[in-house]
Amino acid sequence: APGEDITTWDLSRILSEIDKQFQKTLSYHEVLKKQAIGDYDFLLNKGNVPESYRPTLYDFLVHNALLFYSAGEQAGSKAQDSFVLSAESQVFASAKDFMAWEIDSEDDESPKIRAIKLYQDLLNFHKNGENKDAFIEADLLRLRYGYNQSFGEEKNARYKAALKRFTQKWPDHEMSARAMYRHADVLRGEGELL
């Protein structure tokens, strides 16, 4: 087994350690959900994402974890990720159905399953909030995640239908413009004239 000298670690060990740290940190989710992100401005480089999209320390950490679990490097980090995300699954369902989805898999360490569960928890956390920005953005991001990670003949059709449903549900929200762009991008990829 590799020692504690990080300079001797291989990719698998590095990714495993990052995963452990995210799991440990996110195990304090109840505390993190109560910590306003603004209280940590002096520590964080938040970029250009409005605070309403990442209102708590939990949001900040979950979105970073989602970037990690969605990264292509994950594919080579484990002997196998037995979970295959089907386009026919609930990944493109309504937010309500997606949140209720119970994944039938024994592979609890799958990066895909970890990402799906984080999206479910994030959506559940924000579903009843006064400000819907964090919920709406997380919902659009999970649809994009589904498009990037799923397989199946109906992938494009299900993604386009989900984006259409999204824009109909949130017609006046700025994220609808992003959803329309994603829809147009899929059409362009299919050779449709726009």
Residue map of PLM features:
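Extracytoplasmic/secretory-pathway proteins
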Residues: 1-194
